[in-house]
Regions:
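Conserved alpha/beta-hydrolase "nucleophile elbow" surrounding the catalytic nucleophile
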Residues: 1, 70-75, 183
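Conserved alpha/beta-hydrolase
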Residues: 5-37
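Alpha/beta-hydrolase active-site loop
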Residues: 42-62
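Alpha/beta-hydrolase-fold enzymes
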Residues: 72-157
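Active-site nucleophile elbow and catalytic-triad environment of alpha/beta-hydrolase enzymes
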Residues: 154-171, 176
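Short beta-strand/loop motif that positions the catalytic acidic residue
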Residues: 174, 180-182, 186
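Short alpha-helix in the alpha/beta-hydrolase fold that links the catalytic acid
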Residues: 190-200
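Catalytic active-site module of serine/aspartate enzymes centered on a nucleophile-bearing elbow/loop
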Residues: 208-245
């Protein structure tokens, strides 16, 4: 949540060098999709971001009609895939750090900060600024008002995003296989929440816990750091190939 596509650029370049056609993108209001003015003018929520991800998927399908379509998503990007309007075209999902963001499924040491953010800091900042200035505050990233408030509702519900009407059926009806990778040292999500999100999909194939090597922290976002190129990146490529075999 709140991570620009530029963060994933080194991994995407490496993946392309292995012969994979890759498209990365920014949701509206984020990164290269952020307008020059204030985020106050961006009327986008997470349902809007579902449509953005779907548009990216369809664009890739139009550009390369003969290739199988895979989604490699990190955190929220993986969570949204099961609800895409064009999900029937997806050949498989490789999910990194995909878990329930419900406050009760977060790491115990992280819960009090999440509670403060969801109950006080987030709503107050949005009311004052018209968007969430996360970069200024050192908390996630800058987010459109609607995205922050919808995410807040999800995180305060035991069913997380599945609390939205009809999403249970959508995710259970998604036929694509899911491979989910969870880092044992994830500082945010508990493994239980990651497994719950995994089995919420209709075709959960493989759940794997990544154990960091000595001194090589992984965490919630760290799989994509260049230090993991020799070890973890080839494993991700292997799983992508598994999804189309």
């Amino acid at each position: 949540m709140g991570v620009d596509a530029a963060y994933y650029a080194p991994f995407c370049a490496w993946l392309a060098a292995q012969g994979v056609c890759v498209l990365s993108f920014d949701y509206r209001g984020m990164g290269a999709s952020r307008p020059s003015g204030s985020l106050r003018a961006v009327h986008a929520d997470l349902d809007s971001w579902v449509l953005d991800q779907d548009a990216a998927l369809l664009h890739l399908a139009d550009r390369h009609p003969g290739l199988p379509l895979l989604v490699l998503g990190n955190s929220l990007g993986a969570q949204l895939a099961g609800g895409l309007p064009s999900r029937s075209r997806i050949r498989g999902l490789l999910a990194l750090s995909m878990g329930s963001g419900y406050i009760g499924h977060l790491q115990p040491a992280f819960r009090w900060r999440a509670w403060l953010f969801l109950r006080v800091i987030g709503p107050l900042a949005v009311a004052l600024f018209g968007y969430f200035p996360g970069k200024r505050m050192g908390v996630v990233g800058d987010l459109p008002r609607g995205a922050l408030l919808q995410w807040r509702r999800w995180c305060l519900s035991p069913e997380y995003l599945l609390s939205s009407e009809g999403r249970h059926a959508l995710y259970q009806g998604a036929g694509f296989p899911v491979i989910s990778l969870y880092a044992a040292d994830d500082e945010m999500l508990e493994e239980e929440g990651a497994r719950l999100m995994f089995v919420a999909h209709g075709n959960p194939r493989h759940f794997e816990v990544l154990t960091p090597a000595e001194g090589q922290r992984i965490g919630h976002l760290g799989v994509f750091k260049s230090r993991h190129q020799p070890t973890l990146w080839p494993r991700l490529l292997h799983h992508l190939k598994e999804l189309v075999s």
